[in-house]
């Protein structure tokens, strides 16, 4: 298991993007969280099998039907704290 951290920019707040990401992560069996950032971006931390996380990055780039993703910056790392589900933090 590895950890992926991403910062997603574009029109990604107020457009159901975090809910879309939570659904995708849950369906793929990933754990972690997503949260809005003060600068208008969305932060994502996900843990799982490398191949599944790579598939998840495709979902991050695609976005919800109302969103418009400009960029996804991804950082791969070893697992820090472990999570039991994928949550939307407020």
Label each PLM-derived region with a short phrase.
Residues 1-90:
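Intrinsically disordered, low-complexity, mixed-charge
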